Amino acid sequence: MNYLPIFVDLKNRPVLVVGGGHIAVRKIDALLKAGASVKVVAEKLHSSLQSLTDEGKVEWIAKTFEANQVTNSYLVIAATDDNALNQLVFETAESQQRLVNVVDDQPRCSYIFPSIIDRSPVQIAISSGGAAPVLIRLLREKLEALIPPNLGAMADIATRWRSAVKTQFPQLTQRRRFWEKLFTHQSFQRLTENHQIEQAEALVEAELHNNNPVLGEVSLVGAGPGDAGLLTLKGLQTIQQADVVLYDALVSEAVLELVRRDADKVFVGKLAGKHSVKQEDTNQLLVKYAKQGKRVVRLKGGDPFVFGRGGEELEILKAENIPFSIVPGITAALGATAYAGIPLTHRDHAQTAMFITGHLKPDGNRLKWETLAQGNQTLVVYMGTIKAAELSAELQKHGKPSDTPVAIISNGTLPNQQVQTGVLSELAELAEKAPTPALIVIGEVVKLQKDLAWFGKEAVQFVSTQETLWQKPTLQNKETHWKQAA
């Protein structure tokens, strides 16, 4: 972080601006909005700046710059086209330990002005530290369109009612739920949009004395296969509204970073053969937190309804009359294979894709090997590495060719993703070397992986020339390269 983002109270504080042209006018405009006492040094003034001086809003203190003008200044701005003068202002301010900004000259700035989206009292400041001002301008335009104009009115009302809400709801969780409910209330939004402030405040008072108990709820959210960019928009919104997040071992650190900072995060992870938290205990925690009136998220790797025991957890919640919702996620069979360059279906290789788990309940039904061994299909096995030897043997026993292509994708979609490929007879050996969590893919589509890999260390390397002529890819030292045409 090259700059510390801070908001400064400039009300009635002296700010020195050296320069009287149109650039100085833009800066002075912002300073006046912040309540600063602006003093200008310039040989002559821009017409609009002259008007501000005539109105007594700005003080024109001198035509030439002197070092003593900096002494009592809170901030200093140099906004001239005279490079030597700008340098003098910068050096003088630095020597007196005053924060100084030389406009459009980043090396001579001890502070910079961000781009501002103003919905006072709500303000959003964005900056690239001077690296890409055009990019920041485009971003600001998008944010201006996204952020409602009534945000300031909503914040003003919240300021006036903050003390009363704190008295009515002494617990932080209660207050948070009240404000979230109010700010998303359609009538409240409509009234503030229409500048009907008295009616909006009447609605606040009515909601404040609404004695209906706050019901807890549980949302099952699919965290996706690992890459935080694959988390759905609704999933992101839900985890940022949660009071408590119960997460498992397959949820990546990048996704956990997106959880609201003050939410309680409870690990309820389990790995095949290494249960650290029993499923029954997880179920009871969901019930417990929901009955405390909290907004609970059960955050699961992949999709909650694909080998995630989501159905089992919802049955418990249903029995306890606890409201629930489901936010689907991208399951590993879709995300990891896509990042590995393995299409699940292909007209030449597979017309069916089948997902199975290698981690069955001890008393569960056996797999239908005859069905799994059929051709023209892709078989994806979750949590299957510890059963790789049995999987390989049974599939071959039931007619699957021993040279059927297989892949094991470890840490799919993450920067440390690894893809090992081989044939069915080698599956057990490959599984022993594969880091977990891992996904097994069996089928002819695996043949395409070397040509279609695009992510991570195994990605196809495209080597360009001016002619952009290419030959087919060849394998060299177990890496895929595109050979430049002669």
From Swiss-Prot:
**For the region Precorrin-2 dehydrogenase /sirohydrochlorin ferrochelatase, what residue ranges are annotated?**
1-204
Q: Which reaction does it catalyse?
A: uroporphyrinogen III + 2 S-adenosyl-L-methionine = precorrin-2 + 2 S-adenosyl-L-homocysteine + H(+); precorrin-2 + NAD(+) = sirohydrochlorin + NADH + 2 H(+); siroheme + 2 H(+) = sirohydrochlorin + Fe(2+)
Task: Reply yes or no: does the keyword Transferase apply.
Answer: yes
Recorded E.C. number(s)?
A: 2.1.1.107, 1.3.1.76, 4.99.1.4
Please name the GO terms that the record assigns under molecular function: NAD binding; precorrin-2 dehydrogenase activity; sirohydrochlorin ferrochelatase activity; uroporphyrin-III C-methyltransferase activity
**Keywords on record:** Cobalamin biosynthesis, Lyase, Methyltransferase, Multifunctional enzyme, NAD, Oxidoreductase, Phosphoprotein, Porphyrin biosynthesis, S-adenosyl-L-methionine, Transferase
SUPFAM superfamilies in UniProt = NAD(P)-binding Rossmann-fold domains, Siroheme synthase middle domains-like, Tetrapyrrole methylase
Q: Name one Pfam family in it.
A: CysG_dimeriser
Q: Which residues form the active site?
A: 248 (proton acceptor), 270 (proton donor)
Using the record's annotations, give every residue carrying the modification Phosphoserine.
128
- The superkingdom of the source organism is Bacteria
Q: Which residues bind NAD(+)?
A: 22-23, 43-44
Q: Known Gene3D superfamilies for this protein?
A: Cobalt-precorrin-4 Transmethylase, Domain 1 (3.40.1010.10), Methyltransferase, Cobalt-precorrin-4 Transmethylase, Domain 2 (3.30.950.10), NAD(P)-binding Rossmann-like Domain (3.40.50.720), Sirohaem synthase, dimerisation domain (1.10.8.210), Siroheme synthase, domain 2 (3.30.160.110)
Keyword S-adenosyl-L-methionine in the entry? The reply is yes
| Positions of transmembrane segments | none
Q: In which pathway does it act?
A: Cofactor biosynthesis; adenosylcobalamin biosynthesis; precorrin-2 from uroporphyrinogen III: step 1/1; Cofactor biosynthesis; adenosylcobalamin biosynthesis; sirohydrochlorin from precorrin-2: step 1/1; Porphyrin-containing compound metabolism; siroheme biosynthesis; precorrin-2 from uroporphyrinogen III: step 1/1; Porphyrin-containing compound metabolism; siroheme biosynthesis; siroheme from sirohydrochlorin: step 1/1
- Positions bound to S-adenosyl-L-methionine: 225, 301-303, 306, 331-332, 383, 412
The record's annotation in NCBIfam families points to: cobA_cysG_Cterm, cysG_Nterm, PRK06136.1, PRK10637.1
The record's comment on protein family reads: In the N-terminal section; belongs to the precorrin-2 dehydrogenase / sirohydrochlorin ferrochelatase family.
HAMAP family referenced in this protein's UniProt entry, alphabetically: Siroheme_synth (MF_01646)
Q: What is this protein called?
A: Siroheme synthase
Q: Which organism is it from?
A: Actinobacillus pleuropneumoniae serotype 3 (strain JL03)
